[in-house]
Regions:
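Extended acidic/polar, glycine-enriched regions
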Residues: 161-165, 229-298
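Surface-exposed coil/turn segments at beta-strand junctions on protein surfaces, enriched
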Residues: 42, 102-104, 119, 149-151, ...
Length: 599
């Protein structure tokens, strides 16, 4: 007997397909809007919060907030949109209460806000910086869509749904599943919640949806390209201005897009001279402002050329993690990160293993630190699943869309430590091709593993990459340093290599013999061998050791780690430096001095 014939069927109790209608994934890179420097109204603050371990909210339709039947008689209810416990947004729920520390599942956020139109025909958009992982949006009881991806922004238009008083509900689910990027098995903490800003934007009926401005990467340094997409208009004219260059140029809009090419020779952005220009674009009264640096990053043989000159990437890897804030960041915390990298003598940072806060690239533009940005195609995701690819590609495109105008971003990474299978090769090659097609101004890489049978840098994916990322842990997971030497000798890459990960765990302040694991002395010994390795092989053009700060991860539970990966050059307090910090610092300052002398 089917459900229609079953006379005691209760949909909210018996329908296990309840989630299908809420899984549209319609909030994606195509719905993102340009928000930089636009006026906004913050919806941050105290929200009502309810854990929903059984997904009752979707099953029973909590967004409908029904407390009376059709005859007006009162009904019992299991959820209070306006009476749940209060939680700050942005934040991670894991740090809110001890019992939420390892919670994975759905949770409902709710708050009211007032709205009064300020201009005729204005359009209103809700923008969320990030929510981990599946976020479903409800406004005044109506489902507007959902977004996959725990680290990228998303936008939804709410214009037609608003009244004077409005109820916004967001159901966030951080459950790890096999068909997503990342999948169930990772090596970082699975924070849940809305942990970046929630904002409203009021826009004109026709507005600039996206604007990309860059220096054409043809090695001539004299041509600026602007690609502009508009919404609410198919034709018209876009005006582009760069006042400091005395430039004003217009372009025609055709089918919602305009392309403008300007002959100009701007001062170039570099780590030594992080020059940024104000750029303005205008369409039918909608005027936006960008800060853009102009630079070129190219590969020539085994060398990386930045603005035409060979460069060595003196970097370090970083997780988005804080013992007190989780994945939420503050400007103070981020600026401390950049100060530590500068103190190291660094010019480069690898943002692992997912898109970090957009503030990172904004500050990097300002202070002159180059960035490697990555999507969480991590370890053994389901490379044969079309839905998994769609998820990964969308996260890549959202990241590129968000950070396209950031001069500091020089590398898009399409994954980390993935086995060299046929399915993975096809999956990640397509991602690399997508990145190159959408963004010709940057390089593409991935963090690859060593061929441990041949002791060689060998991965079929490298054919699709501009730079080879190499993750190796000789001295730690593989204690024989002779194998590190053989790896270097056996490898004959035709492209530049970055040692994207290497290192060792160490308890800050714990001392012992150089052979004793988890001691300062052992970590120093690993770094000395690794620095010597990098010096000896000229195809290595950079390194981002693992990593700047210790971070939380449930995989690491021995007596020393106690829930933390301890490979940080600085402890989880982000203050106490380990001795290996100074080993790397000495190497980087030497490289920096050599580069300065060669210019």
């Amino acid at each position: 007997m089917n459900n229609n014939q079953c006379q005691n069927h209760q949909d909210y109790l018996h329908n296990e397909s309840y989630g299908l209608k809420y899984n549209l994934q319609n909030l994606n890179h195509q719905t993102l809007i340009f928000t930089e420097n636009r006026p906004k109204e913050s919806l941050n603050g105290q929200w009502h919060f309810s854990i929903d371990a059984y997904d009752t909210g979707l099953r029973a339709g909590w967004h409908q907030v029904r407390r009376h039947d059709e005859q007006g008689r009162p009904l019992p209810w299991d959820y209070d949109a306006d009476g749940g416990e209060l939680i700050p947004v942005p934040s991670c729920w894991n740090l809110f209460k001890p019992e939420y520390t390892y919670y994975e599942g759905s949770a409902w956020y709710a708050r009211e806000f007032q709205y009064t139109a300020e201009a005729e025909g204005e359009r209103v958009f809700l923008h969320i910086g990030a929510a981990n992982y599946d976020a479903k949006i409800f406004v005044n009881g109506e489902f507007l869509g959902n977004h996959y991806g725990g680290s990228t922004p998303f936008t939804v238009e709410v214009t037609a749904k608003l009244g004077s008083k409005n109820l916004l509900q967001i159901c966030v689910n951080n459950t790890r599943t096999l068909d997503r990027a990342p999948m169930r098995n990772t090596d970082w903490f699975n924070y849940g919640g809305i942990y970046r800003d929630v904002e409203l934007y009021r826009l004109r009926p026709s507005f600039i949806k996206q604007c990309r401005v860059y220096l054409v990467p043809d090695n001539n340094y004299n041509q600026i390209q602007a690609e502009i997409e508009v919404d609410g208009g198919e034709t018209g004219e876009v005006k582009l201005e760069i006042p400091e260059l005395g430039l004003v140029q217009c372009g025609s809009v055709t089918e919602g897009k305009a392309s403008i090419t300007i002959q100009a020779t701007p001062e170039l952005w570099s780590p030594e001279h992080p020059r940024l220009y104000q750029v303005f674009a205008e369409y039918l009264g909608d005027r936006i402002e960008l800060k853009v640096g102009f630079r070129q990053i190219l590969v020539q043989g085994r060398e990386i050329l930045f603005n035409g000159k060979k460069i060595f990437l003196r970097g370090v890897s970083v997780h988005e993690d804080d013992v007190n804030l989780g994945k939420m960041v503050t400007e103070e915390d981020l600026r401390r990160r950049f100060e530590h990298i500068k103190e190291l003598g660094g010019n480069f940072m690898r943002l692992a293993h997912y898109p970090h806060s957009e503030w990172v690239s904004e500050i990097a533009d300002e202070v002159g630190i180059m960035l490697w940005e990555e999507i969480p195609v991590y370890w053994a995701i389901d490379f044969e699943n079309a839905a998994t690819y769609e998820d990964a590609q969308n996260q890549l495109l959202e990241l590129i869309t968000r950070d396209f105008n950031r001069a500091s971003v020089i590398i898009w990474s399409v994954g980390n430590e993935n086995a060299d299978t046929d399915a993975r090769l096809s999956f990640m090659t397509r991602l690399a091709q997508t990145a190159k097609k959408v963004d010709p101004s940057r390089l593409v890489s991935a963090a690859c593993l060593v061929n441990n049978v041949k002791l060689k840098i060998e991965d079929r994916l490298t054919e699709a990459l501009d730079i080879i990322g190499l993750n190796e842990y000789y001295g730690w997971y593989r204690p024989d340093y002779n194998d590190l030497e053989r790896l270097g000798q056996n490898s004959k890459p035709e492209k530049p290599v970055i040692v994207s990960e290497t290192g060792a765990d160490c308890v800050a302040g714990m001392h012992g013999d150089v052979s004793e694991l988890f001691t300062e002395e052992h970590m120093v010994d690993v770094y000395r061998h690794q620095v010597d390795f990098v010096k000896r092989f000229d195809y290595i053009q950079g390194m981002t050791p693992w990593l700047l700060y210790d971070f939380r991860t449930p995989r690491r539970i021995n007596r020393f780690q106690q829930g933390f990966n301890l490979k940080g050059l600085i402890g989880a307090d982000k203050q106490r430096k380990k001795q290996a910090f100074y080993v790397l610092q000495q190497f980087y300052l030497e490289k920096k001095k050599q580069e300065a002398a060669s210019k």
